Swiss-Prot record, chain B:
The keyword Cell cycle applies. This is Cell division topological specificity factor. The lineage of its organism: Bacteria, Pseudomonadati, Pseudomonadota, Gammaproteobacteria, Oceanospirillales. It comes from Marinomonas sp. (strain MWYL1). Belongs to the MinE family. It comes from the Bacteria.
Length: 277, 85
């Protein structure tokens, strides 16, 4: 990690995008859960102060007592604010404050919390708010790696490129002249049928434009909404393509080789095609 | 896709390829500006104001670009003057 002095093994991963609504929180929840499932002690921090939602996606909204800002302001200890996930061992959530705004986050405050977490956790996932303003910059400042969540759509790709510029210039690693943040592209809401029809940017189109290594492609899937309705990270839905694609992405993040899948159009029956179903 | 779609002409470029072309241009443009110093837009405006004291030009007639190579930075200033009558 790129915090001050002491060397710990904790890896800080920011999940970011610039654009809103592309699946940052869904991806943070899925990937954090996936890493914990592999036996690594993991915490997911919601940096979206004022608009907290990670708690809902993780299904722990009724267990929030203290939050990230309370810990920064020393109104609560870290162990009081951390919520232990009920389904997955080794997984904790640090919720965002709902009553403050992004100004409640300070570099020193965030650094203090991350340093304390790094003593105890192997992976720290920072779920960034949308935008390129203070909240997003705080979420990425201390990161060792970044997962850039992108939809195959013009405004999302452009915003992802903006956020890559910020990762390369305004992070602590950049300011200290250290090895740059590891960048990973996660393409979400991918619709192979529309790509085949030339109606949607393909994986290779987006890779050509952003020029960063591909971590995974998550197909558009009904399972994502179903999972968020129920407050269960979609990665636990092992019957769904989206869940399996997230698990593949986690495996790749851990350095394993996994071929891409779910990128082909599913063949429809002749009658269904004829009727336009 | 229903049966009638099969009769549609496929000659126009796909919207995805249009999207890719547009993105490649705008992203390249924005990347080239990324490493420019913050004072550049203001300096550009002041240069335009000075030139305008003498020649009637529009904002788009002045292009300013800063290129960094390994050992030096080159400030390129391109002014399109109006045709003389």
């Amino acid at each position: 990690m790129s915090l001050s002095g002491d060397t710990t093994l904790a890896k800080i991963i920011v999940v970011t995008s610039g654009k809103g609504g592309v699946g940052k929180t869904t991806s943070s929840a899925a990937i954090g859960t996936g890493i914990a499932l592999k036996g690594h002690k993991t915490v997911i921090i919601d940096f979206d102060v004022g608009l907290r939602n990670l708690d809902l996606i993780m299904g722990c909204e009724r267990r929030v007592v203290y939050d990230f800002v309370n810990v920064i302001n020393k109104e609560a200890t870290l162990s009081q604010a951390l919520i232990k996930d009920k389904r997955t061992k080794d997984l904790f959530i640090l919720p965002a404050s709902q009553t403050r705004d992004k100004d409640a986050l300070t570099i020193e405050g965030v650094q203090g919390v991350l340093e304390e977490l790094a003593k105890d956790f192997e992976y720290i996932i920072c779920d960034s708010p949308a935008g390129i303003e203070k909240g997003a910059q705080m979420a990425l400042y201390f990161a060792d790696a970044a997962i850039v969540v992108t939809n195959p759509e013009v405004s999302s790709v452009r915003d992802s490129d903006r956020i890559l510029g910020i990762l390369q210039s305004k992070s602590k690693r950049a300011e200290d002249g250290k090895e740059p943040i590891e960048e990973h592209l996660l393409l979400t809401r991918y619709h192979p049928g529309r790509v085949a029809l030339g109606e949607m940017l393909s994986v290779s189109d987006v890779e050509d434009i952003l020029a960063i290594p591909l971590l995974g492609v998550i197909p558009e899937s009904e399972a994502v909404l179903k999972a968020s309705n129920q407050g269960t990270p979609v990665i636990l839905d092992t019957d769904s393509e989206a869940g399996l694609a997230y698990m593949d992405a986690v495996d790749r993040l851990m350095g394993e080789e996994r071929p891409l899948r779910f990128l082909e159009v599913q063949k429809k029956g002749f009658i269904k095609r004829l009727l336009g179903g | 896709m229903g049966i009638f779609d099969y009769f549609k002409s496929k000659s126009a470029p796909s919207s995805a390829s249009v999207a890719k072309d547009r993105l490649q241009i705008i992203v390249a443009h924005e990347r080239s500006k990324r490493h420019q110093p913050d004072y550049l837009p203001q300096m550009q405006q002041e240069i335009i104001d000075v030139i305008r004291k003498y020649v009637n030009i529009g904002n788009e007639d002045v292009q300013i670009q800063l290129d960094n190579t390994d050992d030096c930075s080159i400030l390129e200033l391109n002014v399109t003057l109006p045709e003389q009558n």
